[in-house]
């Protein structure tokens, strides 16, 4: 008898080399958090300027002269389009990211700062769902047109 995942894969015409990912087995490990992600950007300087001046991240340089933006316990590694480090995404492209960043600073203060920096708010404040609860968000674009969401957890707002 075929396992159900193989039967469904056949019906959905999933390529046979992907069928193994449809197994019911669980991995013997647990992912705890996101350490870093990579943004492919058109200009390192413009990106670093935006994320440090507008969002308050810290620019760092690590081995090989690579650039990153640090905040909290995470970082965003930066790859310049056409000069990516290996290994890299299959199709690295500026402007394809959608990031949600959490702050405890009231969004009214965030919006005032964005206006002072000349960064238009694309949408918000609006209610959304975050990883661990309801959030209120404002949206903007970075220099590569990535969608950047800055949010407060509603539970943090109610505590104040």
UniProtKB/Swiss-Prot annotation:
Alphabetical list of Pfam families matching this protein: Glyoxalase (PF00903)
InterPro entries hit by this protein: Glyas_Bleomycin-R_OHBP_Dase (IPR029068), Glyas_Fos-R_dOase_dom (IPR004360), GlyoxalaseI/FosfomycinResist (IPR050383), VOC (IPR037523)
Record-annotated VOC domain positions: 33-153
Gene3D superfamilies membership: 2,3-Dihydroxybiphenyl 1,2-Dioxygenase, domain 1 (3.10.180.10)
Similarity section: Belongs to the glyoxalase I family.
Protein name: Glyoxalase domain-containing protein 5
Species the sequence originates in: Xenopus tropicalis
Lineage, opening ranks: Eukaryota, Metazoa, Chordata, Craniata, Vertebrata
Gene of this entry: glod5
